[in-house]
Every structure is written in C-alpha cells, then in structure tokens.
Amino acid sequence: MAMKIPKSGYNRFMKEGAQHFKGTDEAVQRNIEACTELASQIRSAYGPNGMNKMVINHIEKLFVTNDAATILKELEIQHPAAKIIIMATEMQEKQIGDNTNTVVILAAALLEHASNLINMGMTPQEVAAGYEQAAEKALEILPSLVVKEASDMKNIEEVRQYLRSAITSKQYDNEDVIADLVAKACVTTCPANSYNFNVDNIRICKIIGSGVHTSKVMNGMVFKRGAEGEIRSAQDARIAVYTCPFDLTQTETKGTVLIENADELVNFSKGEESEVEEQVKAIADNGVKVVVAAGKFGDLYLHFLNKYKIMAVRLTSKFDLRRLCRTVGAQPQARICAPAVNLLGHCDSVSVTEIGDENVVVFDKNSETGKVATIIIRGSSQSRIDDVERAVDDAVNTYKALTKDGKLLAGAGAVEIELAKEIESYGAKAPGLEQYAIKKFAHALETLPKAIAENAGMPTTETLTKLYAEHVNGKKNAGIDVWKREVMDAVAHNIFDLYAGKRLAIKLATDAAATILKVDQIIMAKQATGGPKPRGPKQQDEDDDGMA
C-alpha cells in the first residue's frame, strides 16, 4: 500500500485547489501591482482631454466612455485588492456622483509610493500610519482653500458656472450646451427649500438623430410612444390617470348564452355599449381631455373616447405613472370611473409630436417652475447619447451636492498642488519614520494635476514646476489651462471643484490604500463548481420606455 505524505503549511487543512500568499513580496507587493495596473488603465481617461475607453461587457453591450465609474463597473474585475478600490469608487459615485477617477488614481499613487518605501525598509504599518496622518492634515487644510460658496441655487447663470467643470471632464467642447440644459432643469424643479432637491425629478429622454446641440429641456415629461386613439393633442387639459387597463373586464369563468332571435342578439351587446358610453360620457362631463392608463385600451372604449374628443395615452411602467401623477398633480384611480375634479391633474399642453423619426407624447407645463423636468438628448449614435447622459447625471448629482454643501474649491489641479505644498512642509517637521510617508502622500497628490497635463499633451515636469512656482508666490488658485497649455487662475476662469467631493475622495482613497497595505496574507478557497442552475430574475415592469 502506497504511503500518504501529509501536506505542509496551509495546504494541510485547506481543500485541494485553495491558494495562499503570504508576506511582503507575495501579498503586499502583488496587491500594489494589481492596483497600479488598474489605475494605469483609467489614468488616461482623467481630465478634460481624457481618452475614451471602448468596453464590451459580458452581455456584449458596447460602452464608449471616459467615465471611471462606468468603466470599472462593466469590467467585472476579480482581483480582491483591486475590488477594494472599486468599492471606494462606488461609494464616491453613490454619495457625490463625481470624482470617481480621482479616488482610483490617488489610491494607486499612494500604493505605488508605498511600494518604494517598503523596498527601502519601512513596514507597511508605518506607511499606512503616515498616510492616515497626512490625510488628516489634508482634510484640516482643505476648508482654508474654499474660494466660493454657492448661495443662490435658483440663479441659472451662477448654477451653470458651478456645473461646467463636472461636465467638461466627460464632454469636452459640449460643456456649455449641457451645463445650460442641466442648470435650467435643476432650477425649474428646485423646491422652495433647495436642500430637499430630488435628482429623480430630472428625467432624460434619449432620441437618436441630429446632434448634441439640438438637445433641449422642458418643464414636464416626454414618453417615447404615440397616442392610442385619433386625438393627437389637447390644450389646457384636465388629466385622469388609471392604474388599470382601460377595457372591459372579463370574468374568470366562461358563461353560455342562449339567443333565440335576432332582437336578443342586438340587445345583448347594446347593454354593454351603453354602459361603456355612460362611463366615458361621465369622464368627459368632468372636463377630462386626456386619459392615461397603465394597461391596454379596449376598442369599444377607444371608439367612445374618440367620439367625446378625449386623448388616450398608454404607459406600461408604474414608475412612469407615478412620475406623471407628480408632474400633473393627479390622483391615480384603481378602476374605471369618473374621478372627482380635485383628483384630476392639469397640464397646459399634451401632444404627440415627432422628434427625429420617433413619435413622442409631450406633457408640457408652460411655467417657470414644476415638479418634474425632462432633458431630451439628441446624438448621432446610441453610445454617444449614453455618454452625454452620464455627463448630465454627473452634473445633476453635482447640483444635488451643492444644495447640501455649497463650498467650492479651485479646480484644474490647483487645490491638489496647494495641498501637496502644505503637506510637504508639514512632513518636513514631523518626527519619526512617518515623515517619509507624509512626504510621499504629497507626491501622490501631484499625480492628479500631472495626469491632466499628460492627457492634454503638455510636458508634465515643466508644468508642475510652473504650478509650484505660482503657488510658492502665493497664487493658491493657479491651475492648468488645457486650452492655452499654460498656467492660469482657475477661479477667474470659473473652474471649480466640489469641496464635499474632494474631501470624500481623499478620505476614501487613503482608507482604501491603508486597507490594502495592512493585508499580509491572501487565502483563496477553491471556487465552487456545478450545483443547481440559479433561478432567473422575477418578472418585473418593462423598462422605463427610454426614460433614464
């Protein structure tokens, strides 16, 4: 009988196929390599001149974008250390909606500099402690770098300036058009207390054709579908909304009817017709000009709706119905009836129009303020429209963040250089080995303006030297002008960064880097194979019909 030799180390009590990495070289340096490799893919997408990435996900959907959050989400990265950075970017996206690329680049730069310090003999714990100390100091300095505070969130001109930077990094050359659209939409739907602004009140309707410059914003809602009946428009309309199909209900059991003569046959359907007409007439008598239903419209009901000049619109999504009720101020009805006047909604204009080759129903409130605004995005291709949508989404989230905290910092890399300068001098005075890590934190902050300059085709070392020279002379707002390829005053050019966004990005990037540095072992169990087939998703509503 063959002798069985026991395995050594972790393999003794782990399943066959499990992997185990231990120590600085195997675990820490491997993790750092993975994170820096991830950041090198994303770095070229940073800033106004950032390059686009073409990503094809697992269901073969094509994405052409420079939005870091979208790229990382669709890549489905498996490396556990890289996943920690991705989780940090997801948190940034969820809370602020912008600066996701900043988190990845800064975290990877911190890890890259940490690798050099570890090779020089410092322990990962000492490096992590130094980074945390430097981040604490950076967050202490940051409030003193605030250059402006957004106070009037209902002034379109001011709001447009605040949103331009968030859009420029995604849609270079279209920032003025998109900033104008988003500013109008946000100001239109902003409640009396701007703190209660809801991003869900800004809807997006994407229609292929023409160009981005023909995009427009309107106070109301747009649905990518036509009207059900013959009536195509209604002015100053009362609107009745139903959550049920606008049709005759069928009984579950089948009945048999004995008809003995022609009169009985005629009278059999006459009662049904008169009942339907009574219902539609009662609705018309209440002044209703538009009926919106969640299900299909029956032929008999459509006939009488046309007869009484009532427009019929079908919406298949319950979410669309809810938003429409909020827009027009209607109370949805669970069954077909003539609702009381106070339960009806009102809209200045409801019409079916053609945008490009698409029929759309437009609920237009011709007023300065409203509950819901829709941005109609035009573009030459689906991927182009999707990318503009992401820029709009970032801008709306920026507006939301400004309503919570209106502080603004100088953009174009100005705040990073000023922080790096301050932390460098702080590190020189710090005792102990942490001072090396604090200085490296300052160097890591330089990576962000360096990436802006690099992507704009500018000489990075020369640009950073000029920036430092300006900041040493007391010009705290000196940033990179990617248009003229020189150093300029970011505030004078209305280039701002969100204080809340930058603060959270520094915190998340430092936490992610410190977490990865404190890992000295990676233990990976063998992946499970086989097993029962997972259940498919439950039946849900249809998609939002082109609405985002």
From Swiss-Prot:
GO BP, sorted A to Z: protein folding
Identification of the protein by name: T-complex protein 1 subunit theta
Described purpose of this protein according to its UniProt entry: Molecular chaperone; assists the folding of proteins upon ATP hydrolysis. Known to play a role, in vitro, in the folding of actin and tubulin. Required for correct subcellular localization of pgl-1.
Organism in which the protein naturally occurs: Caenorhabditis briggsae
Subunit annotation: Heterooligomeric complex.
Gene3D superfamilies linked to this entry: GroEL, GroEL-like equatorial domain, TCP-1-like chaperonin intermediate domain
UniProt keywords, alphabetically: ATP-binding, Chaperone, Cytoplasm, Nucleotide-binding
One GO cellular component term: chaperonin-containing T-complex
InterPro entries to which the protein is assigned, alphabetical: Chap_CCT_theta, Chaperone_TCP-1, Chaperonin_TCP-1_CS, Cpn60/GroEL/TCP-1, GroEL-like_apical_dom_sf, GROEL-like_equatorial_sf, TCP-1-like_intermed_sf
Record bears the keyword Iron: no
Localization per record: Cytoplasm
A Pfam cross-reference name: Cpn60_TCP1
Residue segments, region Disordered: 528-548
GO MF annotation list: ATP binding; ATP hydrolysis activity; ATP-dependent protein folding chaperone; unfolded protein binding
Family in the record: Belongs to the TCP-1 chaperonin family.
